[in-house]
Amino acid sequence: RIMAALSRGQNPGPESSIMKNLGANLGQRITELALEAVGDYIVPHQPWQPGSNDLPVGPSAGTMAMPRYFNLRASSIAGGSNEVQKNIVAKLVLGL
């Protein structure tokens, strides 16, 4: 619906704000679950050094779990904070 409205040159309505909030919350929950799954192997960064024979510590998912978590925390701010998006929905749907 959102893309169809935009292609017709119309305002996407409150759906885009709702989808933004749902997507941000879902992404954050998924990365929180990934951190729990990786457990003690959470590492913020393991840079590869040329010529190094060091093996990565823990499962390969552990090397990106923390950066993804931090990156997706910003998704609730980017494009307007969740609170701003909720205010937009309240104005458009409820007329507040």
Which sequence ranges carry the predicted segments?
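Alpha-helical interface subdomain recognition
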Residues: R1-L96
